[in-house]
């Protein structure tokens, strides 16, 4: 799995776990809905750590918790 796929899957997983809609997440995190949808649809080439931190804040979690899951254990090395 590529890193952006893992990020998208983790965002969806946490939204489902916390019963938060994507538009609600956008409002609470201060990120435009289009930016979050770009991350979820893997159109965002490189979801930045600042955006991920804002999403974590909107989800009421930490960056450590966000990345501490099996989705990120076997991500592929990505070459440009």
Predicted stretch roles:
Residues 30-46:
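Recognition helix of helix-turn-helix/homeodomain-like DNA-binding domains
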